[in-house]
From Swiss-Prot:
Spans through the membrane: none
E.C. designation(s): 6.1.1.19
Pfam families: Arg_tRNA_synt_N (PF03485), DALR_1 (PF05746), tRNA-synt_1d (PF00750)
Protein name: Arginine--tRNA ligase
GO biological process, one term: arginyl-tRNA aminoacylation
Subunit structure, interactors included: Monomer.
Organism (species): Polynucleobacter necessarius subsp. necessarius (strain STIR1)
Gene encoding the protein: argS
Length: 575
């Protein structure tokens, strides 16, 4: 239901309720809420305010609902908005919109174009936000878990942008610590001619072929020298570049790449530790420094500084999030794997200590988290667990190439088209389920070009409409004067209803940090279109009816295009 129609009906309901309350000396009513009936034959919108008020007002809910409807029918504009209303069950008011109210969405979409569905931030809500996602260690290629983060984070950023929020995308490079040291040792071992399985191969080394690629490239470079620090710097730079290439192929861009190492070099970590010590948030025991996280809801206190003097990994995380707040980002969302769940309490606890020391008003729930579960890749009915290049996992690059059907024999143009197909499939698939559910990625399904493939199903709806409009040969501007009252079939009614839900669906998905809701919606919209296409011929001889149906299809194509853009998926005109 369009927000304009919804707000008008709520205003009418509020006025009718207020009139009843004043007439009968009853307490002031709350603002009524509207919902979509579960069954289509129950109408377009329902309200249960009579049930809510019946006890407080000591009235029979059906009688109250009837009195409410009678008052509504006396209001100016009610009959233009509502075609009929019936009292159902114990006191539900089910409304059916007038044809004019239902079809108004078509012209609103055509006039709104690419901005249809977008809105401004609600009063008092954040107007800017940071989303941190992917944030992979520069120790290897991006794996499918990073791919899920990239798809979720980018779609979430686009989703928030539709609500007028200025979004900052950030990638946190974990370029300090033991894993980076292991990377350097792995490359050094390859330079020495060792390989996985050899007796002298380091126990914690990375085994993928990419380590050999780094070693070969470094040995041929002018910077080459047998020095562990030089090897470390080259390997990190090499893998950062590789990850950037993968992200570019995936269609994801960041505004900032923040280095963990900078938190040590600029003294941020030391300052955070000092702040927490100065307010009594820490204590020393058994030769280590502890943070009092139990006070903030954690199940036990956590080690900050180990006996060897090194810090545990959540300490720079606290420093990093202090930087986020200090840079003015009061709305921060972290998209991370569910294995990070245990760090949430300790990071928030550390931030509360910093806030206390510095006089900041950081909310206890800062930052927000979207945690995703693992991705399992299936191909030819079997789970794919390793990649030749990565050694122990499937990479994002593998997933995109497999899903697009990329082969070595392809021309550069064919390869680019295949990569686009793969990127679209991977992004749509990885967004199409709630983040907190495990996902099985079926390569064979991604390659199918039929209704079983969800991204093909949605994109084909867009392409089919484009083909119909091309056959017609007119201009979209010609549809502005279409007589939309002619749209009276059951199939068109379902399609109109789905189109009208788009703006509110976007708002709800943004509020709930749930981009999967948009993927669900687009599948439903494509389904309603395909049903309409099979039921109602569009290019009919009746010119007025043809223009009305073409206007409906043009509006549908626009919403499909807008929604796919938010997900980072293309909307092809041909397939």
């Amino acid at each position: 239901m369009l927000s304009t129609n919804k707000n008008r009906l709520i205003e009418m309901l509020s006025a009718a309720l207020t009139g009843l309350a004043q007439e009968r000396g009853l307490e002031a009513p709350p603002t009524p809420r509207l919902e979509r009936p579960k069954a289509v034959d129950h109408g377009d919108v329902a309200c249960n305010i009579a049930l809510q008020l019946s006890k407080a007002w000591k009235l029979n809910p059906r009688e109250l609902a009837q009195a409410l409807v009678e008052r509504l029918q006396q209001q100016t504009g009610f009959n233009e908005l509502i075609a009929s209303c019936e009292i159902a069950g114990p006191g539900f008011s089910n409304f059916r919109l007038s044809n004019a109210a239902k079809t108004a969405v078509v012209q609103e979409i055509l006039s709104g174009g690419t901005s249809f569905g977008e809105s401004a931030p609600a009063d008092g809500s954040a107007t800017s936000a940071m989303i941190e996602f992917v944030s992979a260690n520069p120790t290897g290629p991006l794996h499918v878990g990073h791919g899920r983060q990239a798809a979720l984070g980018d779609a979430l950023a686009n989703l928030l942008a539709t609500q007028g929020i200025k979004v900052h995308r950030e990638f946190y490079y974990n370029d300090a610590g033991v894993q980076i040291a292991n990377l350097a040792l792995s490359v050094q071992a390859r330079l020495q001619g060792l390989k996985p399985g050899d007796a002298k191969w380091p126990e914690q080394a990375y085994n993928g072929e990419y380590i050999a690629e780094i070693a070969t490239t470094f040995k041929a470079s002018p910077e080459f020298k047998d020095d562990i620090e030089a090897i470390r710097q080259f390997a990190v730079a090499y893998l950062r570049n590789e990850q950037d290439i993968d992200l570019k192929t995936f269609g994801v861009k960041f505004d900032c790449y923040y280095l963990e190492s900078s938190l040590y070099t600029d003294g941020s970590v030391a300052q955070i530790v000092g702040d927490l010590q100065s307010i009594g948030k820490t204590y020393e025991s058994e030769g280590v420094l502890w943070l009092k996280t139990i006070d903030d809801g954690d199940d036990k206190d956590r080690v900050m500084r180990k006996s060897d003097g090194s810090f545990t990994y959540f300490v720079p995380d606290v420093a990093y999030h202090t930087s986020k707040w200090n840079r003015g980002f009061q709305k921060v969302i972290n998209v991370q794997g569910s294995d990070h769940h245990g760090t949430i309490a300790r990071v928030r606890s550390g931030l509360q200590g910093v806030a206390q020391k510095r006089g900041w008003d950081i909310p206890k729930t800062y930052p927000d988290y979207v945690l995703h579960k693992m991705v399992t890749v299936m191909r030819h009915g079997e789970e794919v667990k390793i990649s030749k290049r990565a050694g122990s996992y499937v990479t994002v690059r593998d997933l995109v190439e497999w899903s697009g059907g990329v082969t070595p024999e392809m021309t550069s143009e064919e390869r680019e088209l295949a990569l686009q197909r793969g990127r679209d499939a991977v992004r749509f698939f990885l967004i199409s389920r709630k983040a907190d559910t495990e996902f099985v990625f079926d390569i064979d399904l991604a390659l199918q070009q039929n209704d079983e493939n969800p991204v093909f199903y949605v994109q084909y709806a867009h392409a089919r409409i484009s083909s119909i409009l091309q056959q017609w040969g007119g201009q979209t501007s010609d549809l502005a004067s279409a007589d939309l009252s002619l749209l009276q079939s059951k199939a068109s009614d379902h399609l109109l209803r789905c189109l009208a839900e788009y703006p509110e669906m976007l708002t709800t998905a943004a509020e709930e940090l749930a981009p999967h809701a948009l993927a669900f919606y687009l599948r439903n919209l494509a389904g309603d279109f395909h049903t309409f296409y099979n039921a109602d011929r569009v290019l009919v001889d009746d010119q007025n009816l043809k223009l009305a149906r073409l206007a409906l299809l043009s509006a549908t194509r626009q919403v499909l295009q807008n929604g796919l853009k938010v997900l980072g998926v293309s909307a092809p005109a041909k397939m």
